[in-house]
């Protein structure tokens, strides 16, 4: 009996020691994504609007975009227009046919912002959260109908 018990124990040790473990997928995959940003993170919202051509008069509101600037201690939050949306003196929305609709931006809370060469920036540094209004700049009732787009990227202003 002792011999049989020793043989059985040895057999178990051999079986356990020689077994190969394998991974068997049986669930879902989780993904971890990390976005590394500048310290001053400026998030810019979206707006979609429809206006009749007859409404494209000076100061007519097109809409407001939400803007949140965090981690901007001492830095000036800024919005930069795409190269197709400005020239040396004007900011504009562009159509697929490259028609231009002049617009202007203004913070709705009355805070002081400055525009120059495609960049709309807060004149004081620090965090900010609020809305920026987009409105028609000048009488533009002669513009062709169609979809016009203004792309603004959040960032910060450096001197």
Curated annotation (Swiss-Prot):
UniProt xrefs under Gene3D superfamilies: Dr adhesin
Entry keyword annotation includes Signal: yes
Keyword Oxidoreductase: no
A Pfam family the protein falls into: Adhesin_Dr
Signal peptide: 1-21
Subcellular location: Fimbrium
InterPro entries in the cross-refs: Adhesin_Dr, Adhesin_Dr_signal_peptide, Adhesion_dom_sf, Dr_adhesin_sf
Main location: other
GO cellular-component term (any): pilus
Alphabetic keyword roster: Fimbrium, Signal
Role played: Hemagglutinins of uropathogenic E.coli mediate adherence to the upper urinary tract. These adhesins bind to the Dr blood group antigen and also agglutinate human erythrocytes in the presence of D-mannose (mannose-resistant hemagglutination (MRHA)). C1845 is a strain responsible for diarrheal disease.
Similarity-based family: Belongs to the Dr-adhesin family.
Name of protein: F1845 fimbrial protein
